[in-house]
């Protein structure tokens, strides 16, 4: 089985070898601070959140091929114990991102040219780690480069905002505070480089259901705590706060089980759910502690990975 997987990876690598192909990385993130406030007139929730990028990342390989009739041809492969993506490729946010940017740039895909994309998934879905949004941000950058456009073109950020607030963050990366519906950059913070463990129980959480449950039972963050989080200039100074945690833990009790277990482990400084879940992150005092916690979590049957905070963002790495 491993030999078959290696052969498949070799075939994929060869397809994207040579000039005209791009390789991009799409990092994960965690929310150090997430304060969901009231519902606006347009139906969206007002939020204030501090996001921090991580070294853990997906990889996108992209190139333009002669038109096949398809606007975008997307294939995916999951790594590190993740299940294959259970979504039609045409419904993937990567495809949506490319189509929206093509429209913004006035390009027609399908007949004369097709965007070929291969996505290597290492960030779990329904985890609150921003994997899909990061993939979309990377796809926007890759498409712009392949079409000969500047990655600083304002239309990229405009399309990112249409796709979702987290997509905007991954174009910026590092650590930053956002408000509005999560798309308005308030300030950047100095990133940290601490080690952390990501642990995800079985199942996920519907973000919509989590918001609904939070609306039924609001969990306001005190003005004092909100001020401490929103005035911080350094990532390490941000208090870990997430008022969606209770709602998501009720929807998926496994999140609470993971969080409470992490909080009891030696070397763990603090642990909290990221975003609307279902992943929980634990900041650790050393790599050795983080590695031990990850190993023990995997022994319990949970998906777990050690990684680091850092100044990462969706980025073109090399022509491959």
What is each residue range found by the language model?
Residues 170-270, 285-291, 295, 306-320:
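Conserved, helical-rich catalytic subdomain that frames metal- and/or nucleotide-binding sites
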Residues 113, 136, 140-177:
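Contiguous, small/hydrophobic- and glycine-enriched helical/loop subdomains that border
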């Amino acid at each position: 089985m491993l030999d078959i997987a290696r052969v498949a990876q070799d075939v994929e690598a060869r397809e994207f070898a040579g000039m005209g192909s791009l390789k991009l990385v799409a990092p994960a993130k965690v929310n150090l601070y997430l304060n969901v406030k009231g519902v606006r007139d347009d139906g969206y929730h007002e939020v204030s959140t501090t996001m921090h990028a991580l070294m853990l990342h997906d990889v996108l390989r992209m190139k333009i091929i002669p038109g096949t009739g398809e606007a975008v041809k997307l294939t995916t492969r999951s790594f590190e114990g993740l299940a294959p993506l259970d979504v039609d490729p045409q419904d993937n946010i990567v495809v949506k991102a490319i189509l929206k940017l093509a429209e913004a740039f006035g390009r027609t895909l399908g007949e004369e040219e097709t965007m070929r994309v291969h996505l290597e998934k290492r960030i779990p879905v329904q985890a609150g780690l921003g994997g899909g949004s990061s993939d979309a941000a990377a796809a926007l950058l890759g498409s712009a480069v392949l079409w000969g456009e500047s990655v600083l073109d304002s239309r990229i950020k405009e399309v990112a905002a249409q796709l979702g607030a987290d997509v905007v963050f991954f174009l910026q990366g590092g650590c930053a505070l956002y408000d509005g519906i999560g798309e308005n950059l308030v300030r950047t913070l100095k990133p940290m480089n601490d080690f952390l463990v990501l642990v995800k129980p079985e199942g996920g959480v519907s973000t919509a259901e989590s918001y609904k449950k939070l609306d039924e039972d609001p969990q306001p963050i005190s003005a004092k705590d909100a001020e401490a989080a929103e005035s911080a200039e350094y990532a390490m100074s941000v208090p870990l706060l997430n008022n969606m945690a209770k709602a998501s833990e009720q929807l998926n009790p496994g999140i609470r089980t993971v969080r409470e277990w992490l909080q009891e482990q030696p070397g763990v400084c603090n642990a909290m759910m990221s975003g609307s879940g279902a992943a929980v992150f634990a900041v650790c005092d050393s790599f050795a502690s983080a590695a031990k916690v990850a190993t023990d979590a995997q022994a319990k049957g949970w998906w777990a990975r050690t990684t680091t905070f850092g100044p990462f963002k969706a980025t073109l790495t090399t022509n491959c």
